[in-house]
């Protein structure tokens, strides 16, 4: 199985195994699964429902966190970014870090 298909299948399995905390998470889970299963371009930011990542980074004591300035929103934010054609979202998150 090619890398993109393998990463997509792994992501689908991980999200299917996710237990939503509330109704909103249940809805979000279905939206994400629908995009992953039906849109071959869901890893491109041009897709209406596209994949992106976020990382919440803390130090070993959990007392400090790493944030970045978000120019569009003019505020501090956790780190993240669009997949831009990469289905391995862990790799995308690490790229942003």
Language-model-detected regions and their locations in the chain:
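Short, well-ordered loop/turn elements at secondary-structure boundaries
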Residues: 51, 61-62
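Conserved Nudix-box catalytic region and its N-terminal flanking loop in Nudix hydrolases
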Residues: 62-96
């Amino acid at each position: 199985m090619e890398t993109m298909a393998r990463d997509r299948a792994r992501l689908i399995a991980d999200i299917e195994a996710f237990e939503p905390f509330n109704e909103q998470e249940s809805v979000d889970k279905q939206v994400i699964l629908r995009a992953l299963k039906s849109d071959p371009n869901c890893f491109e930011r041009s897709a209406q429902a596209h994949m992106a990542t976020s990382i919440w980074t803390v130090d070993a004591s959990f007392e400090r966190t790493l944030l970045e300035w978000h120019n569009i929103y003019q505020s501090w934010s956790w780190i993240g970014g669009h997949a831009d054609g990469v289905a391995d979202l862990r790799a995308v998150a690490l790229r942003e870090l």
